[in-house]
Regions:
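Cytoplasmic helix-loop-helix junction between adjacent transmembrane helices
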Residues: 98-136
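Intracellular juxtamembrane helix-capping segments at the cytosolic ends
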Residues: 106-120, 312-327
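A late C-terminal transmembrane helix in Major Facilitator Superfamily
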Residues: 328-358
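Helix-loop boundary and gating motifs at the non-cytosolic
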Residues: 1-47, 210-216, 221-238, 245-246, ...
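Structural signature of the two symmetry-related core transmembrane helices
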Residues: 68-83, 274-289
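Helix-to-loop junctions at the C-terminal end of transmembrane segments
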Residues: 53-66, 152, 259-272, 355-356
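Central cavity-lining transmembrane alpha-helices of secondary-active solute carriers
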Residues: 41-59, 250-262
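C-terminal membrane-cytosol helix-exit motif in multi-pass small-molecule transporters
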Residues: 168-191, 377-384
């Protein structure tokens, strides 16, 4: 009973600290007068460092050292937040961002392996696992900016210090909780009789739609990454406060998380055009609100939620499509990580900063992303119609 609570707490917390830091750093750079590429590049730098270090960690990762690596990542997180508090100079922000990327990789890469060592062979259904995985990390990413938005509303420019103090304090229980979870799991395994595994969901006879999961991910996650990186740069220029900008980012991930939770009891919609088409239309509508409604804060709040719904539907499909055919799951999951990582790395710079720099129009990235989502959505719809006819 306590193990799922502990692991859920760990999942939410490490995404909370990432989410808050990735909104605080660009906002502080904007306040210091940094250029658009320096601001939008924060997410790209973090993603690149995280991806490279995750690959390196994968070379030494085993079930035996997974817990120690998770604790090492926690210690690196603590050092990062301590550094952001004690050496907070603007020129040091990218250095601490590099350390955050390393800490994220050292923590997250072994985390799933560590959870597997606690399960003792128990498995959730594919649909449930896909939905809950997508919901848990996005909820943590939502809570981080949300807490910072609340702190920003009540403090005079020092909310970032309070946020980093909270992040550092969270690392203390997080460091020891994996040991507690491991001991509880060992005790449970000794005293309980293993239950026969529940029948697994079998979708292996369904069409292989992994390619469409990756294409949709490019559209949806590019929308999230670009919007998230541009808001700290464009929001203050439009007169929005740190509180409002942070809340917009938070609403994207809340939309993603609650959409994922709504999909826990999914049956067959993943193989029908209507679900993804509806999600894509939400994304297009949300992006267009950023194009034509940037002067109205409520339009941006609504647009953020709609973009979150789009990424929630696609995030579920990404995980589900890659695991629906077990014989290909290993390769597909690896491609998932490459797709998400490269999208998070390239889109803020190329679509975000790049298109604004080339055109001089702040709305151009959102318009381009809405066109990309429409094209991929139409191609997906065409493919699903072909499958239905065959």
């Amino acid at each position: 009973m306590f193990i799922p609570v502990i692991t859920s707490f760990l999942t939410v917390c490490f995404n909370l600290v990432i989410g808050s830091t990735l909104i605080i750093v660009p906002l502080r750079l904007k306040e210091a007068g940094a250029g658009i590429f320096a601001i939008t590049g924060t997410l790209s730098v973090w993603a690149v460092v995280c991806a490279v270090c995750a690959w390196l960690i994968g070379q030494i990762l085993t079930e035996r050292n997974a817990r120690r690596l998770v604790q090492t990542g926690t210690a690196l997180y603590f050092l990062c937040f301590l550094g952001l508090l004690l050496v907070p100079g603007i020129r040091m922000q990218y250095f601490w961002l590099l350390l955050l990327g390393i800490a994220t990789a050292v923590y997250c890469a072994p985390f799933q392996v560590f959870l597997k060592t606690l399960e003792n062979g128990k498995q959730a259904g594919l649909v449930r696992a896909s939905a809950l995985y997508s919901a848990s990390w996005s909820f943590g990413m939502a809570v981080g900016p949300f807490l910072f938005s609340m702190l920003s509303a009540g403090e005079n420019g020092m909310a970032w210090k309070t946020a980093y103090c909270i992040n550092a304090a969270l690392m203390i229980p997080i460091f020891f909780l994996p040991v507690l979870a491991e001991k509880l799991a060992t005790r449970s395994n000794r005293t309980s009789t293993p239950e026969p595994p529940a029948p697994a969901d079998d979708f292996s006879n369904k069409p292989d739609l992994a390619l469409w999961g990756w294409l949709l991910t490019v559209a949806a996650f590019a929308a999230v990454a670009t919007t998230k990186s541009l808001l700290p740069e464009q929001g203050p220029d439009a007169g929005y406060s740190e509180t409002q900008v942070s809340l917009m980012v938070s609403l994207i991930y809340f939309g993603h998380s609650f959409t994922s939770l709504c999909l826990v009891r999914s049956k067959e919609w993943m193989y029908k055009a209507s679900g993804v088409t509806a999600g894509t239309l939400c994304g297009i509508a949300g992006l267009l609100l950023f194009v034509f409604g940037f002067g109205n804060v409520f339009c941006l709040y609504a647009g953020s939620v709609l973009i979150g719904i789009f990424s929630g539907v696609v995030g579920f499909c990404l995980v589900f499509y890659s695991l629906a055919h077990p014989e290909k799951a290993g390769k597909y999951v690896a491609i998932n990580e490459i797709t998400v990582g490269s999208t998070n790395t390239l889109s803020p710079l190329l679509i975000g900063g790049g298109l604004v720099w080339l055109t001089g129009w702040n709305g151009m990235p959102y318009l381009a992303l809405s066109v990309l989502a429409a094209v991929i959505g139409l191609l997906y719809l065409k493919r699903m119609i072909q499958i239905k006819k065959s």
